[in-house]
Amino acid sequence: MYAAVKPLSKYLQFKSVHIYDAIFTLHSKVTVALLLACTFLLSSKQYFGDPIQCFGDKDMDYVHAFCWIYGAYVSDNVTVTPLRNGAAQCRPDAVSKVVPPENRNYITYYQWVVLVLLLESFVFYMPAFLWKIWEGGRLKHLCDDFHKMAVCKDKSRTHLRVLVNYFSSDYKETHFRYFVSYVFCEILNLSISILNFLLLDVFFGGFWGRYRNALLSLYNGDYNQWNIITMAVFPKCAKCEMYKGGPSGSSNIYDYLCLLPLNILNEKIFAFLWIWFILVAMLISLKFLYRLATVLYPGMRLQLLRARARFMPKKHLQVALRNCSFGDWFVLMRVGNNISPELFRKLLEELYEAQSLIKIPPGADKI
């Protein structure tokens, strides 16, 4: 199993320069890794065998293929027999009986779970992919030399002066586009989380409404109720009906009882994903409130920089940032998150010294 998910470890390795913040990483990196791990797990026959296994006397390879392609079904009146160990026996009607077509609930999603998880992983990765293109290696260019020159103070001071010249230049429009592109990717993150929620609800036929009660029963320790609810969404066994031609040319109906072993894992995977998607959506929403506060309150931006710069004197910081736009502040914060607080304070102190030599224009004492 480790060999199957080992390639994901390289995807999650921390880079020396972080172009995403923590919540962005959770959405577009960790979530993608989780979805791909679930995909590999569900598609591995080594651990769960064939995705459908039907009981019969002969031609079982054909029966398995037929029931996999055309789908199995359960009765609307699913009976669940609780066992002593908290497990359950699913009996989608007696095998000898025929379930009327109007009472059949076909499990149409079963063949598509792996593909849907794979598609979701690509969709969740899209904002990170777009930002990586739009970012264009700017932060790496600004910060990477500090990681390479950690033991060389002279080169570090030289690069600090390069950064001071960079932030003293007029890149306001460039930095504003940089900020807008990042916020667009954050909006995309939130939109994807909400649309994914709706997609799974449609895919499983009212999944979230039923599974919320299942998770509550699990939290309360009511495993019988958990089994009853999850059996309706992820039945472990189902019936499959097939027509075969007889010797005289007439068709005979054969029905089989089939096991759906992947649903043992599906019920647990989607219980976890249900909680995970809610958590990620809530964090992204909180991040939007934070982003809005930084746009509306210049004093908050100043205090955030002070906290990162080891509480540099406020007046010095105001002088250092008097010609900075909001986009400049955003790029400065991204730089501050990628270098040590000591180096970041030195950068702001040198900016203060550079700005002190320039005559202060009227009203330019705010970011």
From Swiss-Prot:
Listed transmembrane segments: 22-42, 111-131, 187-207, 269-289
The keyword Nucleus is assigned to this record: no
Disulfide bonds listed in the record: none
Family that this chain belongs to: Belongs to the pannexin family.
Entries under PANTHER family matching the protein: INNEXIN, INNEXIN INX4-RELATED
Biological function: Structural component of the gap junctions in germline cells. Required for differentiation and survival of germline cysts in females and of spermatogonia in males; gap junctional communication between spermatogonia and somatic cyst cells may be required for normal differentiation and survival of spermatogonia.
UniProt-recorded name of the protein: Innexin inx4
InterPro entries xref list: Innexin (IPR000990)
Cellular localisation: Cell membrane; Cell junction, Gap junction
Source species, domain of life: Eukaryota
Extracellular topology ranges: 43-110, 208-268
UniProt KW keywords: Cell junction, Cell membrane, Gap junction, Ion channel, Ion transport, Membrane, Transmembrane, Transmembrane helix, Transport
Residue ranges annotated as Cytoplasmic topological domain: 1-21, 132-186, 290-367
Lineage: Eukaryota, Metazoa, Ecdysozoa, Arthropoda, Hexapoda
Lipid bilayer topology: Multi-pass membrane protein
Organism: Drosophila melanogaster
PROSITE patterns with a match to the protein in the record: PANNEXIN
UniProt key word Manganese: no
GO annotation, biological process: germ cell development; intercellular transport; male germ-line stem cell population maintenance; monoatomic ion transmembrane transport; phototransduction; spermatogenesis
Molecular function GO terms recorded: gap junction channel activity; gap junction hemi-channel activity
